[in-house]
């Protein structure tokens, strides 16, 4: 099974690093595309077996799974250049981009997944939320298997994606804010570190 990741920024790079450490998809079957070669050079220095390219169409040519790891406002632009085949599975990690929006670019028959991972995926510690459209039970299980290897994964309906995204993506920030407030309260009460 070959995977193409479009975008080598924070999340795309983190997913590539996580996949390279896993056992389900060999690192040599992962191709990462990004127009900026600096991100690709850094990624390949860490994981030389990962394939890299600056050309999105080249990256997806033989891919079974195409992961879009670009900013939401770039989705239409990227999908206008890459032309998915019906056998390819599209995975979008762009927050707030719905299936309805993705279908406008790829057509109603395409198998699509929406994923919300977090950057802990590079350390195999992500909590990844998954929604599917036009996917078989086997495809859903494959996504769960892949992303459970990179932390924990849970299949949810798309209608719950926005609310659960706030918890999984921002949850750690809420915890750290509480710790910071507790520390400040301690200082104000005369307890110094």
Predicted regions and their residues:
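Rossmann-like NAD(P)(H) cofactor-binding subdomain of soluble oxidoreductases
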Residues: 37, 56-61, 65-130
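A general structural signal for well-ordered alpha-helical segments in protein cores
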Residues: 8, 12, 40, 63, ...
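Catalytic, metal-anchored helix/loop core of enzyme active sites in primary metabolism
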Residues: 167
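Hydrophobic packing within well-folded, soluble alpha/beta domains
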Residues: 3-5, 66, 91, 143
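NAD(P)+-binding Rossmann beta1-loop-alpha1 motif at the extreme N-terminus of oxidoreductases
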Residues: 1-54, 58, 125-126, 187-189
């Amino acid at each position: 099974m070959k995977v193409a990741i479009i975008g080598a920024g924070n999340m795309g790079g983190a997913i590539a690093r996580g996949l390279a450490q896993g056992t389900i998809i060999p690192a040599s079957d992962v191709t990462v595309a990004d127009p900026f070669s600096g991100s690709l050079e850094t990624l390949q220095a860490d994981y030389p077996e990962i394939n890299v390219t600056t050309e999105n169409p080249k990256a997806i040519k033989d891919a079974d799974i195409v992961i879009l790891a670009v900013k939401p406002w770039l989705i239409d632009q990227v999908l206008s250049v890459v032309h998915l085949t019906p056998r390819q599975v599209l995975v979008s990690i762009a927050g707030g981009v719905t299936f309805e929006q993705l279908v406008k670019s790829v057509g109603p028959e395409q198998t699509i997944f929406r994923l919300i991972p977090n950057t802990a995926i590079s350390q195999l510690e992500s909590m990844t939320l998954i929604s599917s459209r036009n996917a078989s039970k086997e495809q859903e299980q494959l996504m769960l298997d892949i992303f459970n290897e990179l932390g924990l994964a849970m299949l949810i309906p798309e209608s719950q994606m926005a609310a659960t995204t706030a918890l999984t993506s921002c949850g750690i920030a809420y915890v750290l804010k509480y710790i910071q407030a507790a520390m400040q309260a301690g200082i104000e009460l005369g307890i110094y570190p």
